[in-house]
């Protein structure tokens, strides 16, 4: 491994020169096996690797993430896919999937529109089944601790040999302090080594104290996802999978709305009318995603108008009405929501309830904690105060 890698440019083409390197002259813990990753690619790679590594350490399950612009569009652990999962994530065969393949398919499926052109991260060695799935997705690159020969051959051939494949030393531990230069001024802070585990969920402040094992895993998934999401951030999780990440908003309730809206979209993809859509032959996955996204929105006429629907569908679909969407979303339950900082008002809990949130993990510490707890109690939610802020910039 080299001690320095020259990059094409920085965040933008005019920002040259650009490189990554080790200040102490030691070898980089990463090796490029294919392609030529850029500056933002490596920001995604190194943030996403930390997320999946910590997620596996905390849960004992293989983990994956799908990153865009230094925040996760999705993250998940390697639980099996249901038949509905296979359909909405475009798994086109009935073959057995490895746990790491399931983890990435679920991470990618959290918000397929945002994951278009993603950076993939795997906690475990990338196998052939995972590589075959990525082969058919629009993606910029991948980081993993290793690749089987079959997987590497598939990925190295993607995008005419330009797909970015990065291998990282899984034993690498970063220094205790980190620095960042802004406008010529150097900032220094301790690296965030804080460990997220079940001990963080001990202070359940609501009348409902029942947080089952599955919900505890979902809380851990949400909190570790938030630890590597640009703040402010809120994350909805169900069955070990992020289903809505509200990232980078200045207003906490806007984070909650964004995460909730994305969770609603994820759930609407499972509506019988959506599952029954008949697409034209040969349609690409990305075009199916676009068509579904518009179909379930209030702008559905954009894909259902005469002369338009024929571009997407073999049979013209019936409209999915607002009433049908609301009725379907109302059946969602058992969702976990995490927040990287405290809720200042109960309105966040009110919005969370509309997306089926039953469990909440947030730091607490607001002067209106009583109002937040009261609102959670109104809906019978179980809420844990973690007493730990998870800002990330």
Outline where the language-model segments fall.
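Conserved helix-loop functional segments at active or binding sites
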Residues: 54, 228, 265-269, 354, ...
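C-terminal binding/interaction regions
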Residues: 118, 122-123, 136-166, 171-173, ...
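Glycine- and Gly-Pro-enriched alpha-helical subdomains that act as flexible
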Residues: 73-113, 243-342
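Active-site-proximal loop/turn and secondary-structure-junction residues that shape catalytic pockets
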Residues: 71, 126, 239-241, 343, ...
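Flexible, glycine/charged-enriched surface loops at secondary-structure junctions
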Residues: 58-66, 165-168, 231-238, 268-279, ...
């Amino acid at each position: 491994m080299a001690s320095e890698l020259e990059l094409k440019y920085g965040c933008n083409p005019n920002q040259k020169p650009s490189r990554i390197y080790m200040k102490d002259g030691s070898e980089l813990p990463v090796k490029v096996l294919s392609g030529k990753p850029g500056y933002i690619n490596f920001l995604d790679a190194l943030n996403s690797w930390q997320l999946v590594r910590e997620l596996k350490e905390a849960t004992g399950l293989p983990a994956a993430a799908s990153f865009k612009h230094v925040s996760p569009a999705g993250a998940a652990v390697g639980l099996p896919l249901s038949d509905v999962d296979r359909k909405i994530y475009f798994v086109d065969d009935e073959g057995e999937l490895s746990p790491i393949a399931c983890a990435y398919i679920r991470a990618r499926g959290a918000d397929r529109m945002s994951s278009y052109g993603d950076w993939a991260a795997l906690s475990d060695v990338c196998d052939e089944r995972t590589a075959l799935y990525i082969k058919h997705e629009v993606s910029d690159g991948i980081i993993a601790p290793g690749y089987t020969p079959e997987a590497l051959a598939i990925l190295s051939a993607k995008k005419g040999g330009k797909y970015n494949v990065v291998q990282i030393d899984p034993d690498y531990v970063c220094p205790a302090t980190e620095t960042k230069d802004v406008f010529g001024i150097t900032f220094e802070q301790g690296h965030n080594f804080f460990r997220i585990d079940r001990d963080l969920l001990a202070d359940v402040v609501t009348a409902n104290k029942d947080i089952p094992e599955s919900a505890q895993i979902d809380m851990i998934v949400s909190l570790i996802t938030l630890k590597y999401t640009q703040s402010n951030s809120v994350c909805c999780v169900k069955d070990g999978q992020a289903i809505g990440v509200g990232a980078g908003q200045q207003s906490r309730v806007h984070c909650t709305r964004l995460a909730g809206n994305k969770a609603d979209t994820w759930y609407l993809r499972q509506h019988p009318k959506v599952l029954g859509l008949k697409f034209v032959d040969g349609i690409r996955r990305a075009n199916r995603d676009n068509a579904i996204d518009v179909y379930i929105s209030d702008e559905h006429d954009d894909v259902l108008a005469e002369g338009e629907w024929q571009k997407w569908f073999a049979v013209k679909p019936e409209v999915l009405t607002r009433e049908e969407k609301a009725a379907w979303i109302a059946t969602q339950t058992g969702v976990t929501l995490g927040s990287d900082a405290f809720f200042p008002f109960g309105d966040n809990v009110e919005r969370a309830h509309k997306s089926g949130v039953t469990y909440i993990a947030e730091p607490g510490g607001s002067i209106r904690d009583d109002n937040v707890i009261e609102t959670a109690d109104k809906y019978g939610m179980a809420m844990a105060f973690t007493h730990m802020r998870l800002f990330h910039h």
